[in-house]
Amino acid sequence: MNLKVDTTIEEAPEEPTPQKPLGQRAKSEAIAWFWIILAFLFIYSCVGQARVIPSESMENTLLVGDHLIMSRFGYDMGLPFTPWHVPLWRNPKRQQIVIIRAPQLEGAPDLIKRVIGLPGDTVEIHDGHVFINGSQLDEPYLKEPDSPIEPSGKWVVPPANYFVMGDNRGDSYDSRFWGYAPRNTLIGVPVMIYLSVDAPKAPGETRTEAWNPGHLMERFTAYASCLIHPSRVRWGRLFHFF
C-alpha cells in the first residue's frame, strides 16, 4: 500500500505593510519638497536663468528669438533667501560672450555683448578693424566683416573693467558709446540655445520684456507658437552650446 504524503507547505499570508501615521507622512513629504525647492533656488541662482534675445546687436551669432540658458556660476551667484552674493572669482576671456548689467544706464535692460578688451588693454578702432595692443584682432564672428566700424578711436581699459562690443557692429550700443563694463556688472555667460523662434516683429522693435528674467508671458507665448507654427522654429540652432 503506497501512502502519499502531502509535503506542500502553505505560505503564511503576507502581513500588510504598516502605513506611517498621517502626520509622519506629511512631515516626510514636506521635507522632500523643502529640498526640491532649495535645489531649484540654488540652480536658479547659479545657472537656470532663461533669457530671450530681443535685438539684432549680436547677429549672426545670436538671433532675435534665441532662447538661452545663462550660467551665473563664478560671476553673479546669489544665495537663496538672502541678499548676499558669492564673491566673484571667474574672469571672462577675450572674445567670450557675456551678459552684463547696463552700466551708466539706469533702468535699462541687461546687455549681451562680446568681450574685446581686457583690463590694461589698449583698444583701437580704425580703418574698419579692431586692434588690441597694436595687433589686429581676428574676428570671424562679425556679421559684416568688411563694413566700417564707427566711431574710430582709442581706449585704454582700466583695471577691473572690460571693453565690450556687439557682433553686429552697425547695430550695437556698446562700449564705443557708453564706456567700459566694470567687473561687478558681469552677470554671467550663455551656456546653450535651447529654443530659437523666428517670431515676426515690426521693424526696429525690440522685445526687452522677453530678455529680462521674471517676464514669463513672452516665453509661454513663444512655446505655444512653436506648437501651433512649428515652421517658425529654427531647428538647426537648438542645443547649440557656447
Regions found by a protein language model. Give the residues of each.
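Extended hydrophobic leader/signal-anchor segments used for secretion and membrane insertion
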Residues: 2-242
